[in-house]
Amino acid sequence: MFRGIYETTIDAKGRTSLPAKFREVLVDVHGDDRFVITNSAPVDLGAGTFSSGLLIFPYAKWVEFEENFRSSKGLTSAQRNSIMRTIISPAVECCADKLGRLLIPPHLRKGAALERDILFVGVMDKIEVWSQAEREKVRIQDLKNFPSDSETVAELGL
């Protein structure tokens, strides 16, 4: 499982470092140092504004996602096309070098507004990548959407 939030930077050419803990999970848990990086689904911030980060999937999890997507029946044609254009088409297979460095392609950096200060956020079986400013906007939206009744939260074991 990917857990934790790690602050780092990205340079003008898109070079950054994947946190060591996340590299360990890729190899030790998923048995593969390859991963796929792509756009995340847009987060509706209200008033017609959206925020988007990036997602990093272990390679096997990405293949599983593609298989599930191909066999899914509950999507409209428009939803299917939107997911293909937003998430599947821009996806890039990557591998960090021995020092943990990776290169995030320009088309993904631009869509996620990654310029300097970024966050790697562990979310169970995937990793989110955010600009710090965009992540703060989404965090505020998450607080608004957080279950307000203690019963729902207690069911989760919190």
From Swiss-Prot:
Residues crossing the lipid bilayer are none
An annotated Gene Ontology molecular function: transcription cis-regulatory region binding
One cellular-component annotation, GO: nucleoid
Task: Tell where it localizes.
Answer: Cytoplasm, Nucleoid
Keywords for the protein's UniProt record, in alphabetical order = Cytoplasm, DNA-binding, Repeat, Transcription, Transcription regulation
Q: Which CDD domains match?
A: MraZ_C (cd16321), MraZ_N (cd16320)
Q: Which residues form the SpoVT-AbrB domain?
A: 5-52, 91-134
The keyword DNA-binding belongs to this UniProt entry's keyword annotation: yes
GO biological process terms, alphabetically, are: negative regulation of DNA-templated transcription initiation
**One family name in Pfam for this protein:** MraZ
Which InterPro entries does the annotation name? MraZ (IPR003444), MraZ_C (IPR035644), MraZ_dom (IPR020603), MraZ_N (IPR035642), MraZ_sf (IPR038619), SpoVT-AbrB_dom (IPR007159), SpoVT-AbrB_sf (IPR037914)
Keyword Repeat applies:
yes
Matching PROSITE patterns, A to Z?
SPOVT_ABRB (PS51740)
Q: What is its main location?
A: cytoplasm
Assembly mode: Forms oligomers.
Stated family = Belongs to the MraZ family.
- Its recorded name reads Transcriptional regulator MraZ
Which lineage? Answer: Bacteria, Pseudomonadati, Thermodesulfobacteriota, Desulfuromonadia, Geobacterales
Tell me the name of the encoding gene: mraZ
